[in-house]
Amino acid sequence: MYSSRILKYEGRSKFGSSCARILRAKSEIPAVVYGKESDVLHIKINSNEFDKKFAKFTDNTVLLLNDGMVEKCVFIKDVSENLTKKFIYHIDFYEVDRTREIERDISIKFIGASVGVKEGGTLSVLRNTVKVKALPLNLPEFVEVDLTPVKKGDQITLKDIVLSDNVKLSETDENLAVLFVK
């Protein structure tokens, strides 16, 4: 399950623009790992491996950086890239403790066609995200809401969103409407 999230890395001891250019010429990307309770770690990642996986990542994708001995649980904080050349200059990662729950805003994906809309109603989406709490490796990248059973006059609230057992809703008012059909 997590194989698409694992990236191999190596430490690096040389810094600066010229060293970064040399790394990029070898198809490696210079990167930095930041964390609340750890020192900054300077690393390099194979650009081909990262490019293959990068398109599938979201803001909530938890990655596992592995150097063969140590595995770090991280989010992508920033990617410096040249979009015209499709070239990545540098990556910043943020390390999190895999044993502590974190709160994140997760995208809501709406699937299906609402019965109410088919009957001529208008679908109004009020929220595209929901705040959840989970261990980093249990954090979903998005949640799905099926619109199929929603009729005219119906609404879907935060408490109607189905989450897995290891993910909790972290909103103050779970009766807030996510969408309604008028």
Swiss-Prot record:
Pfam families according to UniProt: Ribosomal_L25p, Ribosomal_TL5_C
Annotated CDD domains: Ribosomal_L25_TL5_CTC
Source species, domain of life: Bacteria
GO cellular component: cytosolic large ribosomal subunit
Classification via Gene3D superfamilies: Ribosomal protein L25, beta domain, Ribosomal Protein L25, Chain P
Keyword Coiled coil set for record: no
Keywords in alphabetical order: Ribonucleoprotein, Ribosomal protein, RNA-binding, rRNA-binding
Alphabetized GO MF terms: 5S rRNA binding; structural constituent of ribosome
Stored InterPro entries: Rbsml_bL25/Gln-tRNA_synth_N, Ribosomal_bL25/Gln-tRNA_synth, Ribosomal_bL25_b-dom, Ribosomal_bL25_C, Ribosomal_bL25_long, Ribosomal_L25_dom, Ribosomal_uL5_bac-type
Keyword check for Plastid: no
BP GO terms, sorted: translation
Record text on subunit structure and interactions: Part of the 50S ribosomal subunit; part of the 5S rRNA/L5/L18/L25 subcomplex. Contacts the 5S rRNA. Binds to the 5S rRNA independently of L5 and L18.
Family indicated by similarity: Belongs to the bacterial ribosomal protein bL25 family. CTC subfamily.
Protein purpose: This is one of the proteins that binds to the 5S RNA in the ribosome where it forms part of the central protuberance.
Protein name in UniProt: Large ribosomal subunit protein bL25
Native source organism of the sequence: Borrelia duttonii (strain Ly)
Gene: rplY
